[in-house]
């Protein structure tokens, strides 16, 4: 019969082996994600994690469903849309390194107060880079693990890609309605024009829709949307874009 000391030693070895295996898998996964970040620094994506998730959802009801999506390069997206989106989602986009911890803290405190009052409206503290990480690589699910991976990816993206490329990717994979992805598809879906020809008011309204695009696709004339559009129209000229 093995001695207690020997049994404890065997258990220690097993636990150590399991921990090392988990660490190796985690490191390999991060290396894989980093390789994808490098790939998309130079290659345009044909789809994204959020697109694939949404297409699967739509095809549960309609097997023939397709997404509206068309990639366009940075110089074929109007500066008005770039300004409006930065003003709406991340006014300090050109200055931070991917994550704004103060914004995350304020959003968390606000959401805690909302929850205590029984209110469902929450505020996000994610930068454009974080949103890109989620849209391109992850999913819409909410968990601490996914949020942690989003933060890691945001730093990877910022260290590999210039700001112009980050914004180009974001504008092309952002969700803008039911099955509508990217600036070009959004411009054609709502205004029957191209992303390059969007006016200031049109761009501001599209930017205002970003926090809840499926809802605003079905409710295009709410008081909040009109008010937010007016606010962004005033603010957008004051932000810096790459």
From Swiss-Prot:
The keyword Protease does not apply. Pathway: Cell wall biogenesis; peptidoglycan biosynthesis. GO terms for biological process: cell wall organization; peptidoglycan biosynthetic process; regulation of cell shape. GO terms for cellular component: peptidoglycan-based cell wall; plasma membrane. GO terms for molecular function: pentosyltransferase activity; peptidoglycan glycosyltransferase activity. Its main location: membrane. It catalyses: [GlcNAc-(1->4)-Mur2Ac(oyl-L-Ala-gamma-D-Glu-L-Lys-D-Ala-D-Ala)](n)-di-trans,octa-cis-undecaprenyl diphosphate + beta-D-GlcNAc-(1->4)-Mur2Ac(oyl-L-Ala-gamma-D-Glu-L-Lys-D-Ala-D-Ala)-di-trans,octa-cis-undecaprenyl diphosphate = [GlcNAc-(1->4)-Mur2Ac(oyl-L-Ala-gamma-D-Glu-L-Lys-D-Ala-D-Ala)](n+1)-di-trans,octa-cis-undecaprenyl diphosphate + di-trans,octa-cis-undecaprenyl diphosphate + H(+). Keywords: Cell inner membrane, Cell membrane, Cell shape, Cell wall biogenesis/degradation, Glycosyltransferase, Membrane, Peptidoglycan synthesis, Transferase, Transmembrane, Transmembrane helix. SUPFAM superfamilies: Lysozyme-like (SSF53955). The chain crosses the membrane at residues 18-38. It is a single-pass membrane protein. It comes from the Bacteria. Its EC number is 2.4.99.28. It is found in: Cell inner membrane. Peptidoglycan polymerase that catalyzes glycan chain elongation from lipid-linked precursors. Belongs to the glycosyltransferase 51 family. This is Biosynthetic peptidoglycan transglycosylase. The lineage of its organism: Bacteria, Pseudomonadati, Pseudomonadota, Betaproteobacteria, Burkholderiales. The gene is mtgA.
């Amino acid at each position: 019969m093995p001695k207690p000391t020997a049994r404890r030693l065997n258990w220690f070895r097993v636990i150590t082996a399991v921990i090392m295996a988990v660490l190796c898998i985690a490191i390999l996964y991060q290396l894989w994600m980093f390789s994808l970040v490098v790939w998309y620094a130079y290659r345009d994506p044909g789809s994204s994690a959020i697109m694939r998730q949404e297409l699967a959802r739509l095809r549960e009801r309609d097997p023939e469903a397709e997404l509206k999506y068309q990639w366009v390069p940075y110089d074929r997206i109007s500066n008005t849309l770039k300004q409006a989106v930065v003003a709406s989602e991340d006014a300090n986009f050109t200055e931070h390194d991917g994550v704004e911890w103060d914004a995350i803290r304020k959003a968390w405190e606000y959401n805690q107060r909302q929850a205590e009052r029984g209110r469902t409206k929450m505020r996000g503290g994610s930068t454009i880079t974080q949103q890109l990480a989620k849209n391109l690589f992850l999913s819409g699910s909410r968990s601490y693990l996914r949020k942690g991976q989003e933060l890691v990816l945001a730093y990877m993206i910022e260290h590999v890609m210039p700001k112009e490329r980050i914004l180009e990717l974001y504008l092309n994979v952002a969700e803008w309605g039911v099955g509508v992805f990217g600036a070009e598809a959004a411009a054609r879906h709502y205004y029957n024009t191209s992303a390059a020809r969007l006016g200031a008011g049109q761009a501001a309204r599209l930017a205002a829709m970003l926090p809840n695009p499926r809802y605003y696709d079905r409710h295009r004339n709410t008081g909040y949307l009109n008010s937010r559009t007016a606010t962004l129209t005033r603010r957008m000229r004051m932000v810096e874009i790459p």
